[in-house]
A protein has these predicted regions:
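C-terminal structured "cap/appendage" subdomains that terminate the fold
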Residues: 610-643, 647
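TPR/TPR-like (Sel1-like) alpha-helical repeat modules
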Residues: 545, 586-589, 625-631, 663
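Terminal, low-structured helical/coil segments at or just beyond the last alpha-helical repeat
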Residues: 639-666
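An N-terminal, helix-rich hydrophobic module
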Residues: 1-108, 210
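Acidic, proline/glycine-rich low-complexity intrinsically disordered segments
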Residues: 88-531, 536-543, 547, 553-556, ...
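C-terminal substrate/ligand-recognition segments
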Residues: 570-574, 655
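Amphipathic alpha-helical protein-interaction segments enriched in hydrophobic
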Residues: 518-522, 561-571, 597-613, 638
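Phosphate/oxyanion-binding loops and surfaces in catalytic or ligand/nucleic-acid-binding neighborhoods
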Residues: 54-57, 64-71, 152, 206, ...
Length: 666
């Protein structure tokens, strides 16, 4: 054997082997850096490695047989006998094969199985235009790139809301990647001058802050969609994401050929502010302009329809608006039947307009398949699933929405509500705390956390702290002030400070509650209860009559609204009209049975129990309450102990047994 190793040394096989390994490794590393620049798949690297491994034993044999001399390549003279020479060549070949096989066994599977983290966040693009009002255009480019990427099911794409906090900041890419849970960051800038657009982008590896590639695009305004398409395809290729034919077609689709229509569209989309009706009305004008300039602009019609659905739900329930919004959704679908955003828009009209949750879910699921990375699609699906009583599925959908939008508190707020309805207050509080770590001033989160502290433990400290601090916040909108007053009144009623509650209710002018008929009716019932507690039955009755009048007027405008009938039932009950009150609340149940809506339906069921309780009918109220305590609802033992509406049956043995039974479980 020592003779074999001496021969290896004499024939310089060691030197060739080392040189081959070093050169092969350098070649593989160089290809790994260069190939992505030319959009060549990493699978080429694996092929090169395989060829190098196959070539290794061949190189050893050639090094054994031949030698490089000043006179050229010559056969190396052998000093061994024929049998020893054949044995040595066989041993050399076997050694080379074993080394290559062992290396390939460990290296190739890892190269093949190396899982690329196919996750990306697109940071806000910097506006380099001379006209700073063109910032909306940079936002529009970023938003459209995000939308294109969100159509690729093999990617994980973080939603726009979660990246907007990085606008105008010098990014620490590693920190952002860690915060958002992504491995790749796209950042860029936009400069617009007239109809010319220049877009500069850099794709960065968030794990090491290394630039993967950069590109500049200089195009006409009408060609901006080609930039977005090219970027989406390059990013998909870099992250080894598979593009289905449908996804490829969606990405390559140009929503409009009209540059002015596109500008109006992205301005309108950028104006969407859920709580600011004035901005929404400005956006309406811009959407109208976009569709006037291009009547075939399906995407604009779809977004316009979605916004109209939101306005209809929250600000203006006029039938004309519903007709307009539905027509826009249908128009978008006629123009482009496979447009995910059009199905999304139609889904919202089934949801907000018809309360047809099955039809809404069908449309949302179509939209989600076309926008597999859109957090709002999962949020909408989760909202429908909980109304269908599919709580496990709803939790999963909302968790997915949170993962795609990790710095937006709205999905977390919805997820926390789910957990609270299921009385999993520990999970609800973890979700709220996660949201407050992102936004310590998140109004809705603080409110829910305070409410849940009462629901779980009867603890008012968070609510009182929240309400006290809210009073010091400057420039609160009238709507938020009224909402705070409603919460303050509820706390005072639970604390049995009825006179204070009545004074608080009196401070809120009626015209401030015209869009909130439930609150308007509740205002007069609260004042009536305070008068009743003080022994002023005549005044109490007058306030209950006022509440009744508001509820009846509301029913005239919303005859199929369950909450309107429940409000009327409450007013009638306090007026002593038991049969009429039961008729109204049962009508509310017909309109919103729990079998149709497992999220809001339990509130109507609880209203029925309250009507029975007002008349001292524990035998009818307690079984209803027990059912609500056994399934997701807002009913908890602390709420039953605190709410004065149960006072008429509070000492009844059946009610006390219910409190004891479920209080022990809690």
């Amino acid at each position: 054997m020592s003779g074999f190793f001496e021969e290896l040394k004499r024939r310089k096989v060691y030197r060739v082997a080392i040189a081959y390994i070093v050169a092969g490794w350098a070649l593989a590393q160089g290809l790994a850096q260069v190939l992505p620049v030319f959009d060549i798949s990493n699978s080429v690297i694996r092929v090169v490695i395989a060829l190098l491994l196959i070539g290794f034993p061949v190189a050893l044999v050639l090094a054994w047989v031949f030698d490089f001399t000043p006179q050229g390549i010559k056969a190396t003279p052998s000093i061994a006998s024929g049998s020893h020479r054949r044995r040595n060549i066989f041993m050399l070949l076997a050694t080379g094969i074993v080394i290559s096989a062992a290396t390939g066994f460990f290296l190739l599977p890892r190269a093949a199985a190396r899982k690329i983290d196919k996750s990306i966040a697109v940071l806000p693009f910097e506006n380099l235009s001379d006209e700073k009002e063109n910032a909306y255009f940079a936002d529009g480019i970023q938003d459209d790139i995000l939308t294109n990427l969100s159509k690729i099911g093999d990617l994980k794409v973080i939603s726009r809301t979660s990246v907007m906090s990085y606008r105008g900041k010098t990014p620490n890419v590693r920190e952002i990647g860690k915060m958002l849970g992504v491995s790749t960051i796209l950042e860029g800038s936009v400069r617009r001058a007239g109809n010319r657009v220049r877009v500069n982008v850099q794709l960065i590896d968030a794990t090491n802050d290394q630039h993967v590639w950069a590109n500049d695009y200089d195009r006409d305004l009408t060609d901006v969609f080609a930039i977005q398409t090219d970027l989406a395809q390059k990013i998909a290729n870099e992250l080894q994401a598979k593009l289905s034919p449908t996804e490829k077609a969606q990405i390559e689709n140009k929503p409009t050929q009209n540059g002015e229509a596109y500008l109006a569209f992205i301005q309108a989309r950028n104006l969407f502010a859920p709580e600011e009706f004035d901005k929404l009305k400005q956006a309406e004008q811009l959407y109208d302009r976009a569709l006037q300039l291009d009547g075939n602009f399906a995407l604009a019609a779809a977004y316009y329809s979605q916004m109209e659905a939101w306005i209809y739900r929250n600000f203006d329930k006029q039938p004309e608006r519903a007709q307009k919004g539905r027509a826009l959704a249908q128009r978008a679908l006629q123009l482009q039947p496979d447009l995910p955003e059009a199905h999304w828009a139609l889904g919202y009209w089934y949801y907000y307009g018809d309360l047809n949750y099955d039809a809404a879910l069908k449309e949302f699921e179509i939209a989600q398949r076309g926008l597999p990375n859109n957090a709002d699609a999962y949020l909408a699906i989760g909202a429908i699933q909980r109304r269908q009583g599919k709580w496990v599925e709803s939790n999963a959908s909302l968790e997915k929405a949170v993962s795609l939008n990790p710095k937006d508190t709205w999905p977390m707020q919805n997820l926390g509500q789910n957990y609270a309805m299921q009385r999993n207050f520990a999970a609800a509080n973890r979700t709220y705390d996660r949201a407050l770590a992102i936004d310590p001033n998140a109004f809705g989160i603080k409110e829910l956390k305070a409410k849940d502290a009462i629901a779980e433990k009867g603890d008012f400290s968070l609510a009182q702290e929240f309400l006290a601090k809210a009073d010091t916040i400057p420039d609160l909108s009238a709507d938020i002030k009224n909402h705070l007053a409603e919460g303050r009144i509820q706390v005072l009623v639970f604390l049995r400070k009825f006179d204070e509650a009545a004074r608080e209710a009196t401070k809120v002018p009626d015209d401030a509650l015209t869009r909130y008929p439930n609150a308007l009716c509740g205002k007069y019932i609260t004042i009536g209860l305070a008068k009743k507690r003080s022994g002023d039955e005549a005044s109490a009755r007058q306030f209950f009559e006022n509440a009744r009048g508001f509820a009846e007027k509301d029913i005239q405008q919303r005859p199929n609204d369950a909450s309107a009938h429940a409000n009327l039932a409450g007013a009638l009950a306090w007026l002593g009209q038991k049969e009429a009150a039961l008729a109204e609340v049962k009508r509310a149940q017909e309109l919103m049975p729990e079998s149709k809506d497992a999220f809001d339906g339990p509130q109507i069921t609880e209203a029925l129990a309250q009507i029975y309780a007002i008349f001292g009918d524990a035998a009818s109220a307690v079984p209803i309450l027990e059912g609500l305590l056994q399934r997701p609802s807002q009913v908890t033992v602390p709420f039953l102990k605190l709410n004065p509406v149960w006072d008429s049956i509070r000492t009844d043995p059946q009610f006390q047994a219910l409190i004891d039974k479920y209080g022990a479980k809690a």
